[in-house]
Swiss-Prot record:
GO terms for molecular function: structural constituent of ribosome. One of its GO terms (cellular component) is cytosolic large ribosomal subunit. The gene is ARP-1. Signal peptide: none annotated. It comes from Leishmania donovani. Plays an important role in the elongation step of protein synthesis. Residues 84-105 are annotated as: Disordered. It comes from the Eukaryota. This is Large ribosomal subunit protein P2. PANTHER family: 60S ACIDIC RIBOSOMAL PROTEIN FAMILY MEMBER (PTHR21141), ACIDIC RIBOSOMAL PROTEIN P2, PUTATIVE-RELATED (PTHR21141:SF58). InterPro entries: P1/P2_N_sf, Ribosomal_P1/P2, Ribosomal_P1/P2_euk, Ribosomal_P2.
């Protein structure tokens, strides 16, 4: 993912992505560069424009994006139920009429 992000940063800067530019971005971020991974990214993306890659990724996210909010909502509802249940389980405090503990008798 770091290698693809570095590729994207170079492309978004207006430059044509090159292996040297991607390696420079990774080194600037403190990543130990693996040349074989850089090569793999460039082999996978060969002949594809960055704009086309973004459009393709966006289309994939739209197709699967509807499930995420439902999961988050059900998680929030479950957490609220646990909190409500915990509040019910707390024992009621007994009222002490003698709060002075006999200090001023």
């Amino acid at each position: 993912m770091q290698y693809l992000a570095a590729y994207a940063l170079v492309a978004l800067s207006g430059k044509t992505p090159s292996k040297a530019a991607v390696e420079a971005v990774l080194k600037a971020a403190g990543v130990a560069v693996d040349a074989s991974r850089v090569d793999a990214v460039f082999q996978e993306l060969e002949g594809k424009s960055f704009d086309a890659l973004v459009a393709e990724g966006r289309a994939k996210l739209v197709g699967s994006g509807s499930a995420a909010p439902a999961a988050a909502a059900s998680t929030a509802a479950a957490a609220a139920a646990v909190v409500a249940e915990a509040k019910k389980e707390e024992p009621e405090e007994e009222a002490d009429d003698d709060m002075g503990f006999g200090l001023f008798d």
